[in-house]
Amino acid sequence: DIDKSCNGLVELPAEEKHGILWVHPDPNGSFDLEAQLGELAAEFDSWGFEKYVFQGNTIFEHQMNWKLAIDTFGETYHFNTLHRDTLAKDFHGNCQMYDRFERNHRMMLCLKNIDNLRGQNAEECNVLHACLPVYYIWPNVQLIMGLNGPTLVRVYPEHANPNKSFSRISFFLAP
């Protein structure tokens, strides 16, 4: 048992589902997770997030509004120019798939390795060898599914300045 009166601890509405702990930031708030995720709920189940082990996290501070920080991850056309020595080596910068699920969306960033998979039976291929799925869960969460495990990005506004934000990035690996 924990004495919640110590250290300003406040109980928040939470639900553990799809291998993820979902928390509402308002102690008086509520949420309907299945309604929030919609069609993505079944897809999240298929990834088996519960099997991955937390490895640590890092925080990045941004000199931009949190909404801009979220939106700037929404395209890949700039990879070939701005990231030619890094991301452009692994990704086709002019190709991605985009699906919208109410307020959420999913992007599939096309890996150059997809070229090596042409002609193979799609049922025998691991989708993670062809692309990088990136989920945006409204309003501030990005979930990136990589070959080694998921990366969870949460972007928050800086309370004192709406022109600043920070990202808390958590890394998970298969045991």
What positions do the PLM features span?
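Long, hydrophobic, well-ordered secondary-structure blocks that form the structural core
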Residues: 1-13
